Regions:
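Beta-strand/loop edge motif enriched in small/polar residues
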Residues: 1-190
Length: 190
C-alpha cells in the first residue's frame, strides 16, 4: 500500500487531532506509519513495526515506493502503544528511495517526530516543533540522506528518556548487523 498526500505550499495536507482548537495536546492520536520493502538489518530482513501489531516491514527492494508526502503537516501525534513501542509523528519502516518525502512538518509529537527503521528513503525540508522525545531518530540500518531540516525544541518539554534532537542506533542492542545505520543529514538547524 502507498500513502499519497500531495499538498501544495498554499494548501498543505494537515493530519491533526480530533479535539477542538484550544483543547489539542501532545499524543492526541497515533501518527502516520509507512511500511516498505527496503533493506533493514534485523535477522531475517523483516520486522513488526512499532505500533502496528499486524504490520511488517523490510525486504530486499531498496527501490521501494511507499508513496508521496509533500507539503504535509502532522500535528499532535505520538503515543505509547506498548512499553518501549511508540507511534511517532512519522514512522518509516524499510521505506525505499522511490518514496517522495518533501516539505513535512511535525508539531507537538508525544514521541519522536521522525523515526526511520532501516530503509534508504531520502527526504528534504523537514521541520519539527515542540517534540516531546527525539526530533530525528534512525535505527536498523537506515541509510538515507536528509537535507534541509529544522528542529525547534521547547526547553522545558521532554519525556523520561531525556529527549534529543538526534538519536541514532544500529539497533537497540548495539549490534554490528549489516547494513549499519549510516544516515547523512546536511543543512540542519537545531
Amino acid at each position: 500500500a502507498k500513502l499519497i498526500a500531495q499538498g501544495t505550499a498554499s494548501e498543505p495536507i494537515v493530519f491533526t487531532s480530533n479535539q477542538s482548537a484550544g483543547s489539542r495536546n501532545y499524543g492526541d492520536w497515533g501518527g502516520i506509519i509507512l511500511c516498505g520493502d527496503a533493506k533493514i538489518n534485523v535477522p531475517g530482513g523483516e520486522a513488526q513495526i512499532e505500533g502496528g501489531p499486524r504490520s511488517y516491514y523490510g525486504g530486499t527492494n531498496d527501490n521501494d515506493n511507499s508513496g508521496i508526502l509533500n507539503y504535509v503537516r502532522i500535528e499532535f501525534p505520538g503515543i505509547p502503544f506498548q512499553p518501549d513501542k511508540e507511534i511517532n509523528g512519522l514512522t518509516m519502516g524499510g521505506v525505499g528511495k522511490n518514496t517522495n518525502i518533501d516539505y513535512v512538518q511535525i508539531s507537538y509529537s508525544g514521541d519522536d517526530a521522525f523515526e526511520w527503521f532501516g530503509g534508504c528513503v531520502n527526504a528534504k525540508h523537514l521541520i519539527t516543533l515542540g517534540t516531546w522525545d527525539d526530533d530525528f531518530d534512525t535505527d536498523y540500518g537506515f541509510s538515507g540522506m536528509i537535507q534541509y531540516a529544522v528542529a525547534l525544541r521547547e526547553p522545558n518539554i521532554a519525556d523520561v528518556s531525556g529527549s534529543n534532537a538526534f538519536e541514532s542506533d544500529n539497533d537497540a542492542s548495539g549490534s554490528t548487523n549489516l547494513p549499519q545505520t549510516s544516515a547523512v543529514f546536511s543543512n540542519v538547524s537545531i
